[in-house]
Amino acid sequence: MLTIKKLIIIAIAILFAISSAAQNIKKAEWSKVKMDSSWESLAEQGKESKSTKIINKYKPAVDELNVVIGEAAKDLPAHSPESELSNFAVDAIREFADKWLSQQGIEAKTDMAVTNFGGIRLSNFPKGDITIAQVMACFPFDNRIVILDMPGKYIRQMLQAFARRGRVEALSGVELYIKANKVERFRIAGEPLKDDKIYKVATIDFLANGGDNVYSFKNAVGMTNTNVQIKDMIIDKIKALTAEGKKVDPKVDGRVKIEK
């Protein structure tokens, strides 16, 4: 769990970033606050130091970040080609996208999901209590979940690019086997990939716009933006598991295999 000082820094940084974006700011004011024993001496005199005022001002935001929302059953590493944490994140994206489509009255389901390892900023999510602050540290970017209508031939193109560079992003709903930097076998939604079929792919807007060199997604024939950020979705997913009496306990299932 993050310490109170670290959480204060996070909260102040977030709030400062928000306020700095406002158009009506004309002047920034600041002053030095000594981080020494004068804190305690002022408290003994019944006076409130400047640092205490700062802490009290941001304490509600810090307390909210430090709320425990769930529990990890074990350490959850994140690494390519697949891992417990990446599988949890990308499977959650696909599950969320299916529910979102249903809520919009759309009967179709997603065929696969993709997210990038670069967007998962913790190499290992520790076993034990999970706080909102930890989720935000793991998924700090404002990436929103989108649903693409993708021709199969461009999905194949993307997978071939993954194979050539020797690094696969996190995948859900697929079985992929790469050997000697070539795609030897690929199944999507349990079936062989068809180049002329349109597939629904859940991902994040960063990748949909060609981020991390995933240029194939720019050939989508349709894109729907859910306007839900991945970190908010992950927080809701963990809360839902907790409400069901479950821990976060994803598995590595061999969905992606790579041989040299």
Language-model features: locations:
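Bacterial Sec-dependent N-terminal signal peptides
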Residues: 1-30
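Short, functionally important structural connectors and interaction interfaces within domains
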Residues: 17, 68, 77-80, 142, ...
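Feature captures C-terminal
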Residues: 24-41, 87-260
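N-terminal targeting signals for Sec/Tat export/insertion, comprising classic cleavable signal peptides
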Residues: 32-64
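Short, flexible segments with low predicted structural confidence
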Residues: 60, 64-66, 126-130
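Acidic/histidine-rich, surface-exposed loop or edge segments in extracytoplasmic proteins
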Residues: 63-80, 214-220
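Mature, extracytoplasmic segments of signal peptide-bearing proteins
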Residues: 79-88
